[in-house]
Protein backbone atom coordinates (compact mmCIF):
# COMPACT_ATOMS: atom_id res chain seq x y z
CA UNK A 1 0.00 0.00 0.00
CA UNK A 2 1.46 3.42 -0.90
CA UNK A 3 -0.02 4.99 2.21
CA UNK A 4 1.42 2.28 4.40
CA UNK A 5 4.80 2.71 2.70
CA UNK A 6 4.83 6.44 3.42
CA UNK A 7 3.85 5.88 7.04
CA UNK A 8 6.52 3.21 7.37
CA UNK A 9 9.15 5.55 5.95
CA UNK A 10 8.21 8.26 8.43
CA UNK A 11 8.08 5.88 11.35
CA UNK A 12 11.17 3.89 10.50
CA UNK A 13 13.57 6.50 9.08
CA UNK A 14 12.43 10.11 9.06
CA UNK A 15 10.95 10.32 12.55
CA UNK A 16 14.00 8.95 14.43
CA UNK A 17 16.26 11.19 12.35
CA UNK A 18 14.03 14.18 13.08
CA UNK A 19 14.10 13.46 16.81
CA UNK A 20 17.88 13.09 16.76
CA UNK A 21 18.18 16.35 14.81
CA UNK A 22 15.99 18.25 17.29
CA UNK A 23 17.83 16.77 20.27
CA UNK A 24 21.16 17.78 18.73
CA UNK A 25 19.93 21.35 18.28
CA UNK A 26 18.62 21.45 21.86
CA UNK A 27 21.93 20.12 23.16
CA UNK A 28 23.88 22.74 21.22
CA UNK A 29 21.58 25.54 22.38
CA UNK A 30 21.96 24.50 26.02
CA UNK A 31 25.76 24.25 25.90
CA UNK A 32 26.19 27.53 24.01
CA UNK A 33 23.93 29.27 26.51
CA UNK A 34 25.93 27.93 29.45
CA UNK A 35 29.24 28.91 27.85
CA UNK A 36 28.41 32.33 26.43
CA UNK A 37 25.57 33.96 28.39
CA UNK A 38 27.67 34.95 31.40
CA UNK A 39 30.41 36.42 29.20
CA UNK A 40 27.81 38.44 27.29
CA UNK A 41 26.40 39.85 30.54
CA UNK A 42 29.89 40.84 31.70
CA UNK A 43 30.62 42.56 28.39
CA UNK A 44 27.33 44.44 28.54
CA UNK A 45 28.01 45.64 32.09
CA UNK A 46 31.56 46.64 31.16
CA UNK A 47 30.30 48.63 28.18
CA UNK A 48 27.76 50.51 30.28
CA UNK A 49 30.45 51.26 32.87
CA UNK A 50 32.78 52.62 30.19
CA UNK A 51 30.02 54.90 28.88
CA UNK A 52 29.44 56.30 32.36
CA UNK A 53 33.18 56.90 32.83
CA UNK A 54 33.33 58.62 29.45
CA UNK A 55 30.49 60.98 30.41
CA UNK A 56 32.18 61.74 33.73
CA UNK A 57 35.44 62.65 32.01
CA UNK A 58 33.79 64.70 29.25
CA UNK A 59 31.08 66.69 30.98
CA UNK A 60 30.37 68.70 27.83
CA UNK A 61 28.59 65.63 26.41
CA UNK A 62 25.24 64.36 27.58
CA UNK A 63 23.78 60.87 27.40
CA UNK A 64 21.78 61.58 24.24
CA UNK A 65 24.80 62.90 22.33
CA UNK A 66 26.84 59.85 23.31
CA UNK A 67 24.06 57.47 22.23
CA UNK A 68 23.86 59.23 18.86
CA UNK A 69 27.59 58.86 18.41
CA UNK A 70 27.41 55.16 19.27
CA UNK A 71 24.62 54.77 16.71
CA UNK A 72 26.80 56.38 14.04
CA UNK A 73 29.58 53.93 14.89
CA UNK A 74 27.20 50.98 14.61
CA UNK A 75 25.88 52.14 11.24
CA UNK A 76 29.43 52.56 9.96
CA UNK A 77 30.30 49.06 11.15
CA UNK A 78 27.28 47.57 9.39
CA UNK A 79 28.45 49.20 6.14
CA UNK A 80 31.91 47.68 6.52
CA UNK A 81 33.75 50.73 7.89
CA UNK A 82 36.01 49.92 10.83
CA UNK A 83 35.46 52.60 13.53
CA UNK A 84 39.13 52.34 14.54
CA UNK A 85 40.30 53.45 11.12
CA UNK A 86 40.45 56.78 9.32
CA UNK A 87 40.06 58.02 5.77
CA UNK A 88 43.62 56.96 4.87
CA UNK A 89 42.93 53.26 5.46
CA UNK A 90 42.55 50.99 2.42
CA UNK A 91 39.10 50.68 0.92
CA UNK A 92 36.96 47.68 1.72
CA UNK A 93 36.02 47.60 -1.95
CA UNK A 94 39.38 47.58 -3.68
CA UNK A 95 39.83 44.74 -6.17
CA UNK A 96 41.43 42.32 -3.72
CA UNK A 97 38.73 42.85 -1.10
CA UNK A 98 36.00 42.70 -3.75
CA UNK A 99 37.43 39.42 -5.05
CA UNK A 100 37.42 38.05 -1.51
CA UNK A 101 33.82 39.20 -1.03
CA UNK A 102 32.76 37.56 -4.31
CA UNK A 103 34.28 34.31 -3.08
CA UNK A 104 32.33 34.49 0.18
CA UNK A 105 29.12 35.01 -1.82
CA UNK A 106 29.42 32.05 -4.18
CA UNK A 107 30.67 29.75 -1.38
CA UNK A 108 27.78 30.88 0.88
CA UNK A 109 30.21 31.71 3.70
CA UNK A 110 28.94 35.27 4.13
CA UNK A 111 30.97 36.57 7.06
CA UNK A 112 28.56 39.44 7.61
CA UNK A 113 31.22 42.07 8.25
CA UNK A 114 30.81 43.47 4.74
CA UNK A 115 27.77 43.69 2.48
CA UNK A 116 26.56 45.85 -0.41
CA UNK A 117 25.01 49.07 0.86
CA UNK A 118 23.76 50.51 -2.43
CA UNK A 119 20.51 49.43 -4.07
CA UNK A 120 22.30 48.47 -7.28
CA UNK A 121 24.88 46.47 -5.33
CA UNK A 122 22.22 44.54 -3.43
CA UNK A 123 20.25 43.70 -6.60
CA UNK A 124 23.41 42.59 -8.40
CA UNK A 125 24.42 40.47 -5.39
CA UNK A 126 21.14 38.54 -5.59
CA UNK A 127 21.54 37.64 -9.26
CA UNK A 128 25.28 37.08 -8.86
CA UNK A 129 24.59 34.55 -6.08
CA UNK A 130 21.85 32.82 -8.09
CA UNK A 131 24.33 32.12 -10.87
CA UNK A 132 27.50 31.82 -8.79
CA UNK A 133 26.39 29.32 -6.14
CA UNK A 134 25.48 26.54 -8.64
CA UNK A 135 28.66 27.31 -10.59
CA UNK A 136 30.67 27.01 -7.39
CA UNK A 137 29.07 23.66 -6.57
CA UNK A 138 29.86 22.28 -10.03
CA UNK A 139 33.42 23.63 -9.93
CA UNK A 140 34.18 22.21 -6.49
CA UNK A 141 32.68 18.87 -7.50
CA UNK A 142 34.92 18.62 -10.57
CA UNK A 143 37.96 19.89 -8.66
CA UNK A 144 37.38 17.34 -5.92
CA UNK A 145 36.96 14.61 -8.52
CA UNK A 146 40.26 15.64 -10.10
CA UNK A 147 42.06 15.49 -6.76
CA UNK A 148 40.54 12.13 -6.03
CA UNK A 149 41.49 10.79 -9.45
CA UNK A 150 45.19 11.05 -8.54
CA UNK A 151 44.64 8.36 -5.94
CA UNK A 152 43.68 5.84 -8.60
CA UNK A 153 47.39 5.35 -9.31
CA UNK A 154 47.43 3.16 -6.21
CA UNK A 155 45.54 0.53 -8.18
CA UNK A 156 48.69 -0.16 -10.20
CA UNK A 157 50.49 -1.64 -7.22
CA UNK A 158 49.47 -5.21 -7.98
CA UNK A 159 52.81 -7.03 -7.97
CA UNK A 160 52.34 -8.04 -4.35
CA UNK A 161 48.65 -8.71 -3.77
CA UNK A 162 49.05 -9.08 -0.02
CA UNK A 163 50.46 -5.59 0.25
CA UNK A 164 48.05 -3.86 -2.10
CA UNK A 165 45.52 -3.13 0.62
CA UNK A 166 48.27 -1.78 2.91
CA UNK A 167 49.61 0.48 0.16
CA UNK A 168 46.16 1.84 -0.59
CA UNK A 169 45.44 2.57 3.07
CA UNK A 170 48.82 4.26 3.51
CA UNK A 171 48.25 6.28 0.35
CA UNK A 172 44.90 7.54 1.58
CA UNK A 173 46.33 8.30 5.02
CA UNK A 174 49.23 10.21 3.45
CA UNK A 175 46.84 12.20 1.27
CA UNK A 176 44.67 13.12 4.25
CA UNK A 177 47.71 14.04 6.37
CA UNK A 178 49.30 16.26 3.72
CA UNK A 179 45.94 17.86 2.98
CA UNK A 180 45.42 18.60 6.65
CA UNK A 181 48.83 20.27 6.87
CA UNK A 182 48.37 22.32 3.69
CA UNK A 183 44.74 23.32 4.32
CA UNK A 184 44.16 23.31 8.09
CA UNK A 185 47.58 23.70 9.76
CA UNK A 186 49.88 25.91 7.69
CA UNK A 187 47.26 28.54 6.68
CA UNK A 188 46.16 29.15 10.31
CA UNK A 189 49.81 29.55 11.26
CA UNK A 190 50.25 32.09 8.46
CA UNK A 191 47.05 33.97 9.31
CA UNK A 192 48.02 34.00 12.99
CA UNK A 193 51.37 35.55 12.13
CA UNK A 194 49.93 38.21 9.81
CA UNK A 195 46.85 39.10 11.88
CA UNK A 196 48.44 38.82 15.32
CA UNK A 197 46.13 35.98 16.37
CA UNK A 198 46.91 32.94 18.45
CA UNK A 199 47.03 29.61 16.64
CA UNK A 200 43.74 28.70 18.28
CA UNK A 201 42.12 31.78 16.78
CA UNK A 202 43.68 31.09 13.39
CA UNK A 203 42.50 27.48 13.39
CA UNK A 204 39.06 28.60 14.56
CA UNK A 205 38.88 31.05 11.66
CA UNK A 206 39.98 28.38 9.18
CA UNK A 207 37.43 25.84 10.37
CA UNK A 208 34.54 28.32 10.57
CA UNK A 209 35.44 29.50 7.07
CA UNK A 210 35.86 26.13 5.36
CA UNK A 211 32.73 24.78 7.01
CA UNK A 212 30.93 27.80 5.42
CA UNK A 213 29.57 28.85 8.83
CA UNK A 214 31.23 32.26 8.55
CA UNK A 215 30.35 34.03 11.80
CA UNK A 216 32.39 37.08 10.88
CA UNK A 217 34.05 37.49 14.29
CA UNK A 218 37.42 36.72 12.68
CA UNK A 219 38.07 37.90 9.12
CA UNK A 220 41.45 38.31 7.44
CA UNK A 221 42.61 41.65 6.12
CA UNK A 222 40.33 43.89 8.21
CA UNK A 223 42.69 45.36 10.81
CA UNK A 224 43.22 49.05 9.93
CA UNK A 225 46.45 49.17 11.91
CA UNK A 226 48.14 46.64 9.62
CA UNK A 227 49.49 47.08 6.11
CA UNK A 228 48.55 44.08 3.97
CA UNK A 229 49.94 43.22 0.58
CA UNK A 230 47.58 43.89 -2.31
CA UNK A 231 46.87 40.22 -3.07
CA UNK A 232 46.50 39.09 0.55
CA UNK A 233 42.72 38.70 0.55
CA UNK A 234 42.72 37.33 -2.99
CA UNK A 235 45.09 34.58 -1.88
CA UNK A 236 42.79 33.91 1.06
CA UNK A 237 39.88 33.49 -1.37
CA UNK A 238 41.88 30.98 -3.44
CA UNK A 239 42.74 29.08 -0.25
CA UNK A 240 39.03 28.92 0.57
CA UNK A 241 38.18 27.39 -2.81
CA UNK A 242 40.95 24.79 -2.57
CA UNK A 243 40.04 24.04 1.03
CA UNK A 244 36.40 23.44 0.17
CA UNK A 245 37.41 21.08 -2.63
CA UNK A 246 39.74 19.19 -0.29
CA UNK A 247 37.02 18.86 2.35
CA UNK A 248 34.67 17.45 -0.28
CA UNK A 249 37.29 14.79 -1.08
CA UNK A 250 37.85 14.05 2.61
CA UNK A 251 34.15 13.53 3.26
CA UNK A 252 33.89 11.13 0.33
CA UNK A 253 37.07 9.25 1.28
CA UNK A 254 36.43 9.05 5.01
CA UNK A 255 34.11 6.08 4.82
CA UNK A 256 36.34 4.48 2.18
CA UNK A 257 39.39 4.73 4.46
CA UNK A 258 37.51 3.12 7.34
CA UNK A 259 36.38 0.31 5.05
CA UNK A 260 39.92 -0.31 3.84
CA UNK A 261 41.28 -0.35 7.38
CA UNK A 262 38.71 -3.01 8.18
CA UNK A 263 39.75 -5.04 5.12
CA UNK A 264 43.42 -4.62 6.06
CA UNK A 265 42.73 -5.91 9.56
CA UNK A 266 40.97 -8.92 8.11
CA UNK A 267 43.93 -9.48 5.78
CA UNK A 268 46.43 -9.36 8.65
CA UNK A 269 44.39 -11.80 10.72
CA UNK A 270 44.20 -14.19 7.78
CA UNK A 271 47.92 -14.15 6.92
CA UNK A 272 48.65 -17.34 8.85
CA UNK A 273 45.96 -19.25 7.00
CA UNK A 274 47.11 -17.88 3.64
CA UNK A 275 50.75 -18.78 4.34
CA UNK A 276 49.72 -22.39 4.90
CA UNK A 277 47.84 -22.61 1.60
CA UNK A 278 49.31 -23.70 -1.71
CA UNK A 279 50.80 -20.87 -3.83
CA UNK A 280 48.45 -21.46 -6.72
CA UNK A 281 45.42 -21.55 -4.43
CA UNK A 282 46.27 -18.31 -2.65
CA UNK A 283 43.43 -15.85 -3.15
CA UNK A 284 44.22 -12.48 -4.63
CA UNK A 285 43.24 -9.56 -2.47
CA UNK A 286 40.39 -7.81 -4.16
CA UNK A 287 41.03 -4.19 -5.02
CA UNK A 288 38.59 -1.67 -3.71
CA UNK A 289 37.99 0.91 -6.43
CA UNK A 290 38.96 4.42 -5.42
CA UNK A 291 37.25 6.36 -8.12
CA UNK A 292 33.51 6.38 -8.26
From Swiss-Prot:
BP GO annotations: endoplasmic reticulum calcium ion homeostasis; membrane repolarization during action potential; potassium ion transport; regulation of glucagon secretion; regulation of insulin secretion involved in cellular response to glucose stimulus; regulation of release of sequestered calcium ion into cytosol; regulation of somatostatin secretion
Chain ranges inside the bilayer that never cross it: 98-116, 202-221
Protein's membrane topology: Multi-pass membrane protein
Expression across tissues: Expressed in pacreatic beta-cells (at protein level). Expressed in pacreatic delta-cells (at protein level).
Swiss-Prot/TrEMBL keywords: Cell membrane, Disulfide bond, Endoplasmic reticulum, Ion channel, Ion transport, Membrane, Metal-binding, Mitochondrion, Mitochondrion inner membrane, Potassium, Potassium channel, Potassium transport, Transmembrane, Transmembrane helix, Transport
Induction: Down-regulated when pancreatic islets are exposed to a cytokine mixture of TNF, IL1B and IFNG.
Region Selectivity filter 1: start-end pairs: 108-113
Record family assignment: Belongs to the two pore domain potassium channel (TC 1.A.1.8) family.
Oligomeric form and interacting partners: Homodimer; disulfide-linked. Heterodimer with KCNK17 and KCNK5.
Name this polypeptide is given: Potassium channel, subfamily K, member 16
Amino acid sequence: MPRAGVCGCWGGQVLPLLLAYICYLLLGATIFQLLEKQAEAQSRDQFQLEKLRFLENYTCLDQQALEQFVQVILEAWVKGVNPKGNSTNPSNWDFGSSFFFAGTVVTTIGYGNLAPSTEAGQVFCVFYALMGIPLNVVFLNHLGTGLRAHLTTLDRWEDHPRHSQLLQVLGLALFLTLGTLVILIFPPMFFSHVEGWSFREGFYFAFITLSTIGFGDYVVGTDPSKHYIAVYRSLAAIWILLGLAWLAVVLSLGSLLLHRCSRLWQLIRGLDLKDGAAPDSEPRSQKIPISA
